[in-house]
Amino acid sequence: MEVRNMVDYELLKKVVEAPGVSGYEFLGIRDVVIEEIKDYVDEVKVDKLGNVIAHKKGEGPKVMIAAHMDQIGLMVTHIEKNGFLRVAPIGGVDPKTLIAQRFKVWIDKGKFIYGVGASVPPHIQKPEDRKKAPDWDQIFIDIGAESKEEAEDMGVKIGTVITWDGRLERLGKHRFVSIAFDDRIAVYTILEVAKQLKDAKADVYFVATVQEEVGLRGARTSAFGIEPDYGFAIDVTIAADIPGTPEHKQVTHLGKGTAIKIMDRSVICHPTIVRWLEELAKKHEIPYQLEILLGGGTDAGAIHLTKAGVPTGALSVPARYIHSNTEVVDERDVDATVELMTKALENIHELKI
C-alpha cells in the first residue's frame, strides 16, 4: 500500500526542534503550535496551565484529541564553585543517556548556551565502578565556565532548564531520527489532522497538552474544562523490534502502521472504541497494529477519568529508543495515524456508546 500523505519535513523539523520541557513549553513549542494550527480552526486559546486548546466548531458530539507538547529534559539544581552544573531530571530521563552528549542550556526564550553531559572518565574509575550505570550524583553539565560567578554571568541560575541538542534527520528510505518525537510526532499529527479535516461530524477540540511527562497534568485540567463526550490521546509507543528483544516483548513494529491502543499502565481504552477504530482501519485500508503497553501511560489516562468518566481511545506512533535524543519513527506509521484519526472524526457520529 502506497503512502498517501508524505511527511511535511519542514513542519516536522520545526515541531521537534522547538524547545519545551515540562512546565516550560512557552520556551518555543507553544508558539509553533498556535502559529501552525490557527488557520484551520475557529478559535485558539491558552488556558491557565499553558495547554493550547484549538476549537474546530461542528455539530455532533464534543471530542477532545490530546497530544502532549512537553519533552523530557533537565533542570539545574546547583552550580559548583568551578562552574559545573548539577542537574535533576524533568520526566523519565535515564542518566545513561546523558554522558558525552551535547545540550542546550536555556537562558531565556530563544536564547541558549551549549553544554556537555559528563561524568568521571572511565580511565580513572575503579574497575567495579566501570560496570555500573552512573547515578545522578555522578553526572554534571560542563558549559565551559571556570567558576560559579562565570556560569551565573552566562545566565545560568537554579531552575534553568536544559534540553538535548538534537535535530531531525532522515534515516533510510522511510524513517526519521530526532530529539523529542515523544511526543512531538503526535503534535505534528494533530496539526495534520486539523489541516485535512473538512467534514467533521463532531465539535472538535485539538489540545496540545503540557506536563504529560511529569504526570498527565495538562490533560487532566484541559479535559475538566472541555468536558468531552469522547476523548482520544495520540502519543508514541515502544517499538522494541530490535536485536535482543523477545518477540512477545516488542510491543509494536516500525512500518506496520498506527497502533490502536488496548491498554497501558494508565488506561484501559474503551473496548467499543477499540473495535470501532479497528473496523475503520480495515474499511479504509489503513495499516494498523494493536498495542498493549505494560509500562508507561498517556494523556488518555487522565482524560478517561474526567468528572463522571469519558469513553476514551488512543492511537500511538511506534518509536524506537524513546526518551533519548535519537528517537526513530517511520513516516508510514505517522501517515496511518493521521489518516485513521481523520477518518474517526469524519465518522464519529456512527460511534454508539
UniProtKB/Swiss-Prot annotation:
Annotated thermal dependence: Optimum temperature is 100 degrees Celsius over a broad pH array. At temperatures lower than 70 degrees Celsius, less than 10% of the maximum activity is detected. Highly thermostable. Shows half-lives of 24.8 minutes and 10.03 hours when incubated at 100 and 80 degrees Celsius, respectively.
Known cofactor(s): Zn(2+); Co(2+)
Highest taxon listed in the record's lineage: Archaea
Entry keywords, A to Z: Aminopeptidase, Cobalt, Hydrolase, Metal-binding, Metalloprotease, Protease, Zinc
Keyword Protein transport: no
Any Pfam family matching the protein: Peptidase_M42
Amino-acid positions noted as binding Zn(2+) 1 in the UniProt annotation, renumbered to this chain: 68, 182, 235
InterPro entries: Peptidase_M42, Peptidase_M42_aminopept, Peptidase_M42_dom2
Cofactor note: Binds 2 Zn(2+) ions per subunit. Can also use Co(2+).
Residues noted as binding Zn(2+) 2 in the record, renumbered to the chain: 182, 213, 323
List of catalytic residues: 212 (proton acceptor)
A GO molecular-function descriptor: metallopeptidase activity
pH dependence (record): Optimum pH is 7.5 with Leu-pNA as substrate. Strong activity is still detectable at pH 6 and 9.
One of the GO BP terms on file: proteolysis
Activity regulation description: Inhibited by EDTA and bestatin in vitro. Is insensitive to papain, antipain, chymostatin, leupeptin, pepstatin and aprotinin.
UniProt EC number: 3.4.11.-
Miscellaneous: The hydrolytic mechanism is nonprocessive. Therefore, the enzyme does not process one substrate molecule completely before starting with another one. Instead, the reaction products are generated by multiple rounds of substrate digestion.
Record family assignment: Belongs to the peptidase M42 family.
Biological role stated in the UniProt entry: Functions as an aminopeptidase, with a clear preference for leucine as the N-terminal amino acid. However, can also cleave moderately long polypeptide substrates of various compositions in a fairly unspecific manner. Has neither carboxypeptidase nor endoproteolytic activities, and it is devoid of N-terminal deblocking activity. Is involved in protein degradation, performing degradation of oligopeptides produced by the proteasome into single amino acids.
Oligomer and partners: Homododecamer. The assembly of six dimers results in a tetrahedral-shaped structure; all 12 active sites are located on the inside of the tetrahedron. Substrate access is granted by four pores with a maximal diameter of 18 Angstroms, allowing only small peptides and unfolded proteins access to the active site. Beside the four entry ports, TET contains 12 small product release openings, which are large enough to allow passage of only single amino acid residues.
Name by which UniProt lists this protein: Tetrahedral aminopeptidase
Upper classification of the organism: Archaea, Methanobacteriati, Methanobacteriota, Thermococci, Thermococcales
